[in-house]
Amino acid sequence: MGFKCGIVGLPNVGKSTLFNALTKAGIEAANYPFCTIEPNTGVVPMPDPRLDALAEIVKPERVLPTTMEFVDIAGLVAGASKGEGLGNKFLANIRETDAIGHVVRCFENDDIVHVAGQINPAEDIDTINTELALADLDSCERAIQRLQKRAKGGDKDAKFELSIMEKILPVLENAGMIRSIDLDKDELQAIKGYNFLTLKPTMYIANVNEDGFENNPYLDRVREIAEKEGAVVVPVCAAIESEIAELDDDEKIEFLQDLGIEEPGLNRVIRAGYKLLNLQTYFTAGVKEVRAWTIPIGATAPKSAAVIHTDFEKGFIRAEVIAYDDFIQYKGEAGAKEAGKWRLEGKDYIVQDGDVMHFRFNV
C-alpha cells in the first residue's frame, strides 16, 4: 500500500512536465496513452536511504521500496464543476485520490502562455479551489435532499449525517474548503464515503525557475496562502526535474552536485505527500528481500502485519522488533540481539517509523 495523489493545476503551469519527470523516475504502471478523459497514472518508489543502509548489512537477493501512485488530472479550467473543458470526468478522477498536489506557476516565461494572461498564484489557486468547492457543493446539496427524506423516517444515521451536511453547506456556498471546518472523528467517519474534494489533504507544488527558489514574490504569495490553510508548500523546478529524470544514477549525482542540490525536488514532493497522509514506514529484512511497508502513523502491530498478508493479522502471536538505529548500529539482527536491542511485542504495540520487524503468526 502506498497512496494515490492527484496532480491538479491550470493548463500551462508545468503539471505534465512534473508528472512525466515523476513517472520517468519511477516504475511504469498503467500508463494509458494520454487522451482527453483517462488520467495518466504513474507509480513511483518512495526515496528512503534507510532501505539501502539495511540492504548493505543484510545483503538480500532483492530490495523493494514502498510505492506511491500519482495521477495526472488534465488542466482544470474555470467552469470545470459545470462540465466546462473536460470538467466532470476530471473531477471524478480526483475524487478517487487520497491527496491533492496542486501545481502553481511561480515563474515568468514569455514563451509559455498563462491561461489568464498574467502570473498570479493567488488567482490561480482561487480558480481551482472554487471549482473543487462547487463540485463539493453539488454533492452536498444532493446528499441533503436524500438525507432529509431518510431523517423524516426516523433514520438516526441520516439525522447525524444531515447535521454535518448543514454545517458544511454554508462554507461551500462561499467557495470555502471543508478541511477548514473543525469536524470531529465521528463526523469525518460519517462523511468519508462522499469523497469530498475540499476535505482531501492538499500540498502546493510551486513550480519555479532554476533561480526562483529565493527572492521570488510568487513563491512567497503561495506560502502565505498555504500558511492560512495549514497546507504544505514544496518548491520545485519542473524543467530541472525533467532533465534529472533523463539521466542515469551516476550522471544524476554529478548533475545535482553541479547545481549544489542534495536530492531531486521530486523526492521532496513524494515525502511531503507521505507526511500529508500521516503515513510511515516499517521494514522487513531477510536474506530473500529487504522491503519497506507503508502504514498509517499509530497502527498497531497486527494492523501493520496485515499489509503483508491478512493472515498475519488474523493469526498474530507476537512481533519481533528492532529499532532501525539499533539495527544499523549493531550491524544486523544478531548484533542487536547481543546488545539486548531485540524485543518481542504484543498486539497492542504501536509500530514506530523505521522499526525492523518479523511477525510470528499461526493460521
UniProtKB/Swiss-Prot annotation:
Residues 278-361 form the TGS domain. Disulfide bonds: none annotated. GO terms for cellular component: cytoplasm. The keyword Transcription does not apply. Transmembrane segments: none annotated. PROSITE patterns: G_OBG (PS51710), TGS (PS51880). Pfam families: MMR_HSR1 (PF01926), YchF-GTPase_C (PF06071). Residues 3-256 form the OBG-type G domain. ATP binds at N12, V13, G14, K15, S16, T17. Mg(2+) binds at S16, T36. One of its GO terms (molecular function) is ATP binding. Keywords: ATP-binding, Magnesium, Metal-binding, Nucleotide-binding. CDD domains: TGS_YchF_OLA1, YchF. Coiled coil: none annotated. Its cofactor is Mg(2+). InterPro entries: ATPase_YchF/OLA1, Beta-grasp_dom_sf, G_OBG, GTP-bd, P-loop_NTPase, TGS, TGS-like, TGS-like_dom_sf. NCBIfam families: redox-regulated ATPase YchF. PANTHER family: OBG GTPASE FAMILY, OBG-TYPE G DOMAIN-CONTAINING PROTEIN. Belongs to the TRAFAC class OBG-HflX-like GTPase superfamily. OBG GTPase family. YchF/OLA1 subfamily. ATPase that binds to both the 70S ribosome and the 50S ribosomal subunit in a nucleotide-independent manner. This is Ribosome-binding ATPase YchF. It comes from Pasteurella multocida (strain Pm70). The gene is ychF.
